[in-house]
Curated annotation (Swiss-Prot):
The keyword Repressor does not apply. A non-essential component of RNA polymerase (RNAP). The gene is rpoY. It comes from Bacillus licheniformis (strain ATCC 14580 / DSM 13 / JCM 2505 / CCUG 7422 / NBRC 12200 / NCIMB 9375 / NCTC 10341 / NRRL NRS-1264 / Gibson 46). One of its GO terms (cellular component) is DNA-directed RNA polymerase complex. Pfam families: RpoY. Coiled coil: none annotated. It is an enzyme of class 2 (transferase). InterPro entries: RpoY (IPR009907). This is DNA-directed RNA polymerase subunit epsilon. Keywords: DNA-directed RNA polymerase, Nucleotidyltransferase, Transcription, Transferase.
Length: 69
């Protein structure tokens, strides 16, 4: 499954909506996504499973890249 993760790059700062980034991660569960990203010290805001029409739409973006962690 592919998950879209909304995050702040630094866990040490107060979250600011304008600094939110997103990445795509392949994993079997939300828990696995969190464990894969733990070493990066991201401030994870939201994790969303991406499938079906939503996945096809995201694939059209030039920024679509699934991280292999």
């Amino acid at each position: 499954m592919i998950y879209k993760v909304f995050y702040q790059a630094s866990n040490d700062e107060v979250p600011v909506r304008e600094k939110t980034d997103s990445i795509f991660v392949e994993a079997q569960s939300e828990r696995e996504v969190r464990s894969k990203l733990k070493p990066y010290n991201y401030n994870i805001e939201f994790i969303q499973q991406v499938e079906g029409a939503f996945l096809e739409y995201e694939k059209q973006s030039e920024n679509f890249k699934v991280l292999e962690l």
